[in-house]
């Protein structure tokens, strides 16, 4: 490696370390190892919504000080799940305010008696604001519904010692102009029309504001001297893979640190010592996207071992992929080769579970993505679960990782209070997802009012901050503003633009799509000279509704919209368009309105994951593009299980 590159990596490491100090501690995904144990708390929790007028009865009566059932009637609530669709009560489905969860966990004796062991409580997602107590003692608070947070509860559970601990979590789903996403509480004061004290939650985003414990809650242990964080950056010189790492160890300043890199067969291909360094991998197997290489998604394992002078040892294994990302004036490059985003936008959304994590649904979705020939998706409009990103790493599905910056439309949402929180959210997001090879770009917002005057400073500050957190990935936000009015566009690396020609305007006029889309692309590129992704397009289709000639909301109309977009995209992808992401992968729930028939129906699959006509149109297109661009997929591959084919 050249001295120039060595100096760059040293400088980069110093910058990453300085940026990481903005957040206290790392956020490694909890997993078992020879030194770590894990206890999942998924299952039924006690649950109670605070129905008092001010929603503060739980705090006033200190429900956290005794078992929740002693405060009044409780429900059984599954975790993970949203609470909204679990009962038959519309009042709970639409509830705004504080809800309370409680669970008692039985602790292994060694957890409570071994003072050389840390016991950590981790909540992977609590939407939106959460306050947590253990045995009635406050341990942590967190704002934001999509990223994990932790509390070291060792002293609490080892002071007895105890055999159980009672975990109480209060969650408030109220959104304000300064939350992410923003919202507004509107009080209806006309008592001739509304009950006294009546209020509703207004939002400017088009999905249901599901709430609750959406992902797993776990207890895990580490030694008192432990691996706190790992940052990995990869590069390639000729056929040598370069893996630069920085490792944070907490609990002691006197330790030895060993690092090994193993290939998929378990063979050690490189090793090092010390808390920072660089591993060189001759003839490295690169991480390639699905359909871009005959062996996509190659993953190595970085095994880290820390040993103290007292012989306390901690182990952690981090899966990594060796790959590079770069952007030119008209191309998006992965490992130096042009990459075209042929993908979808998604939502974490399903029947009954709401936004609750569900393994069967997740695996089904990935099988559908590969059936489509899709190689990418955007985490619209918030960070998805870590398990989603782990599967993307394993399957080669490229990710545009989006924060919850959706619905930023009011002027007050561009103020300093909102900006401070947005910066913190990006720090949390980068800290969590920085080591995933599938993540190739950060998105800091979706459809903000970026033509407002404060947007220029807001997005310049936000994007500069995100780039300082991660120098290796491009940064974007998704715009629906006019090309010559968007004040944030000068600061992004890739233009992402949403448009719904013949849908939200020129209703039913399919003939305007191609000229309007062509003008859109030419205007954006002429103005900004950056690669462009068509980050949203589509039309609602009610399953089973057929009209010929096509009419809005029929499957034929959705099909015709896609075909008209594709005609222009086929021309522009030869120039500067680097991707297309259909809106949406599947139908999803929204607030009730005259414009939504039990949710948004722009999915190419139903909410139950059954294909509409447009799914077959997109499948044919994506496999054709993969073949035309030299992808390694001559068509869908079929694996047989008995007499039934399973296509993936």
Curated annotation (Swiss-Prot):
Keywords, comma-separated and alphabetical: Endoplasmic reticulum, Glycoprotein, Glycosidase, Hydrolase, Lysosome, Signal
Gene Ontology annotations of biological process type: carbohydrate metabolic process; chondroitin sulfate proteoglycan catabolic process; heparan sulfate proteoglycan catabolic process; hyaluronan catabolic process
Glycan attachment positions: 172, 416, 627
PROSITE patterns: GLYCOSYL_HYDROL_F2_1, GLYCOSYL_HYDROL_F2_2
Record field: catalytic activity: a beta-D-glucuronoside + H2O = D-glucuronate + an alcohol
Primary subcellular site in the record, as a coarse category: other
EC number: 3.2.1.31
Matching Pfam families: Glyco_hydro_2 (PF00703), Glyco_hydro_2_C (PF02836), Glyco_hydro_2_N (PF02837)
Signal peptide positions (record): 1-22
Superkingdom of origin: Eukaryota
Regulation: Inhibited by L-aspartic acid.
UniProt keyword Signal, yes or no: yes
Gene Ontology MF annotations: beta-glucuronidase activity; hydrolase activity; protein domain specific binding; signaling receptor binding
Gene Ontology CC: one annotated term: lysosome
Active site residues of this protein: 447 (proton donor)
Disulfide bridge map: none
Subcellular location field: Lysosome; Endoplasmic reticulum
Family named by the database record: Belongs to the glycosyl hydrolase 2 family.
Record text on subunit structure and interactions: Homotetramer.
Functional description taken from the UniProt entry: Plays an important role in the degradation of dermatan and keratan sulfates.
Protein name per the record: Beta-glucuronidase
Organism whose genome encodes this protein: Mus musculus
Gene, per the UniProt record: Gusb
């Amino acid at each position: 490696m050249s001295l120039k590159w060595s100096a760059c990596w040293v400088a980069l490491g110093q910058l990453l370390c300085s940026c990481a100090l903005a957040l206290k501690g790392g956020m490694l995904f909890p997993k078992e190892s020879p030194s770590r144990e894990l206890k999942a708390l998924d299952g039924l929790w006690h649950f109670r919504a605070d129905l008092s007028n001010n929603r503060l009865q739980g705090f006033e009566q200190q429900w956290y000080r005794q078992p929740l059932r002693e405060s009044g009637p409780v429900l059984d609530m599954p975790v993970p799940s949203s609470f909204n669709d679990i009962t038959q009560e519309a009042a709970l489905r639409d509830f705004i305010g504080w809800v309370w969860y409680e669970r008692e966990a039985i602790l292994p004796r060694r957890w409570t008696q071994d003072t050389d062991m840390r016991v950590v409580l981790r909540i992977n997602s609590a939407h939106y604001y959460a306050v947590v107590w253990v045995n009635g003692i406050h341990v942590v608070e967190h704002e934001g519904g999509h990223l994990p947070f932790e509390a070291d509860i060792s002293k609490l559970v080892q002071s007895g010692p105890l055999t159980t601990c009672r975990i109480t979590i209060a969650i408030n789903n109220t959104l304000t102009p300064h939350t992410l996403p923003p919202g507004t509480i509107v009080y209806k004061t006309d008592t001739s029309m509304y009950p006294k004290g009546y209020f509703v939650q207004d939002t400017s985003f088009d999905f249901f504001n599901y709430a609750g414990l959406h992902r797993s809650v776990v207890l895990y242990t580490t030694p008192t001297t432990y691996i706190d964080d790992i940052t990995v950056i990869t590069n390639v010189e000729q056929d040598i893979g370069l893996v630069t790492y920085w490792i944070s160890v907490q609990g002691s300043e006197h330790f030895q640190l060993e690092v090994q890199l193993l290939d998929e067969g378990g063979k050690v291909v490189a090793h090092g010592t010390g808390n920072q360094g660089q591993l060189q991998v001759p003839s490295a197997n690169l991480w390639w996207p699905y359909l871009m290489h005959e062996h996509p998604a190659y993953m190595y394992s970085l095994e880290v071992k820390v040993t103290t002078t007292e012989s306390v040892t901690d182990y952690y294994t981090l899966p990594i992929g060796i790959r590079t990302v770069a952007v030119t004036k008209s191309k998006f490059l992965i490992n130096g080769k042009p990459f075209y985003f042929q993908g979808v936008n998604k939502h974490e959304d399903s029947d009954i579970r709401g936004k609750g994590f569900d393994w069967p649904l997740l695996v089904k979705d990935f099988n559908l993505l590969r059936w489509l020939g899709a190689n990418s998706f955007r985490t619209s409009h918030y960070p998805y679960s870590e398990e989603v990103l782990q599967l993307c790493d394993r399957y080669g599905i490229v990710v545009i990782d989006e924060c919850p910056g959706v619905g930023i439309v009011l002027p007050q949402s561009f103020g300093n209070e909102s900006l401070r929180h947005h910066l913190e959210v990006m720090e949390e997001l980068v800290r969590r997802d920085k080591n995933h090879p599938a993540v190739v770009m950060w998105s800091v917002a979706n459809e903000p009012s970026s033509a407002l005057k404060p947007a220029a400073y807001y997005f310049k500050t936000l994007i500069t901050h995100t780039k300082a957190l991660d120098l290796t990935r491009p940064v974007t936000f998704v715009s629906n503003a006019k090309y010559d009015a968007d004040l944030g566009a000068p600061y992004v690396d890739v233009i992402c633009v949403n448009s719904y020609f013949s849908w939200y305007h020129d209703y039913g006029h399919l003939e305007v799509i191609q000229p309007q889309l062509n003008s859109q692309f030419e205007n954006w590129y002429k103005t900004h000279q950056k690669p462009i992704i068509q980050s949203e397009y589509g039309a609602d289709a009610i399953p089973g509704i057929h009209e010929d000639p096509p009419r809005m909301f029929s499957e034929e109309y959705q099909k015709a919209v896609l075909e008209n977009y594709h005609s222009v995209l086929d021309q522009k992808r030869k120039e500067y368009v680097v991707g297309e992401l259909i809106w949406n992968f599947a139908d999803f729930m929204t607030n009730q309105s005259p414009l939504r028939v039990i949710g948004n129906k722009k999915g190419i699959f139903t909410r139950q994951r059954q294909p509409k006509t447009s799914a077959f149109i997109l499948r044919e297109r994506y496999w054709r593009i993969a073949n035309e661009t030299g992808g390694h997929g001559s068509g869908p591959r079929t694996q047989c299980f008995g007499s039934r084919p399973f296509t993936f």
